[in-house]
């Protein structure tokens, strides 16, 4: 379901624009659609036809994203296994400091070699209402003031739905534009569409290597764009929005943690409106990769930072419950597998 479909369903049961706006905001807050102001009953502000039609519609909206299981982590994050209306599963991650990582696809087609989500390929797209429903669901547990599109899927491959969700969250959803973070491997459509949007999110770009051939090997089905061109496109967007680009770099021991790569980062990012997020590799099943030792990570940060590239180590939230970067995949493969024989 897309957001306009949800709003049309409200109109179909007699809701006027003012009612639709009010009920949309209630939904975004994780509240019942007919919630009123303090000591105000639904009959005080909703037409009879809407009140009669809401129970069935509310069931349909609730089914967009149902919590199947919750897995709290020691760092205050929590991985949420979310069941969609058709029984497919995605994962959201509640982050410390009121953040939420949402999924935009069931599976992923990019197939990054260090990421679990793409192991099963792309199963289907999420509608914009299904994306927003993850936020509404999370807000039943805790406040959500930041939404990052870094869960399952490549947001650029579901661009219309993701941009619809971002627009609603950044207008009616009470989330600042800089706190909406669109993550991509570098699809050129992103750089065409995002500057045209009413809500322009912050942008995170998956870099991972300054060597074009190595980057293509790590992200085998990502657009074949040179790292230099990716950074220039990012810089143009950063200057237009006033938000620095967050460059993502999964640190892989013996692969992209060498001195040549560090000097390549300086060459590309020094003087740019950018933040380098170093993400030590998170362990997966049947690992072929490792993260560098802690001492080496500290050396890299000091080297880059002292030479003019703002560098942060992003120790992914929820690693102990497989909620960290690269670890997300639908545990529903097992759940659905158990269902099928019935």
Swiss-Prot record:
- May I have one GO cellular component term? cytoplasm
**Oxidoreductase found in the keyword field:** no
Q: Cofactors per UniProt?
A: [4Fe-4S] cluster
Q: Which Gene3D superfamilies match?
A: Aldolase class I (3.20.20.70)
Identify the residues that bind [4Fe-4S] cluster: 108, 112, 115
The superkingdom listed in its UniProt entry is Bacteria
Q: Which GO terms describe its molecular function?
A: 4 iron, 4 sulfur cluster binding; metal ion binding; RNA methyltransferase activity
Task: Tell me the keywords, alphabetical order.
Answer: 4Fe-4S, Cytoplasm, Disulfide bond, Iron, Iron-sulfur, Metal-binding, Methyltransferase, S-adenosyl-L-methionine, Transferase
Q: A GO biological process this protein is involved in? A: rRNA base methylation
Subcellular location(s) of the protein: Cytoplasm
All disulfide bonds of the chain are: 101-325
Q: Which Pfam families match?
A: Radical_SAM
Instruction: Tell me where in this chain the Radical SAM core domain is found.
Output: 94-320
Does the keyword Magnesium belong to this entry? no
Q: Which residues form the active site?
A: 91, 325
Note describing how the cofactor binds: Binds 1 [4Fe-4S] cluster. The cluster is coordinated with 3 cysteines and an exchangeable S-adenosyl-L-methionine.
Q: Principal localization? A: cytoplasm
Protein name, per record:
Probable RNA methyltransferase PST_2231
Q: What is its EC number?
A: 2.1.1.-
The family this protein is said to belong to: Belongs to the radical SAM superfamily. RlmN family.
Where along this sequence does the record place binding of S-adenosyl-L-methionine? 153-154, 183, 206-208, 282
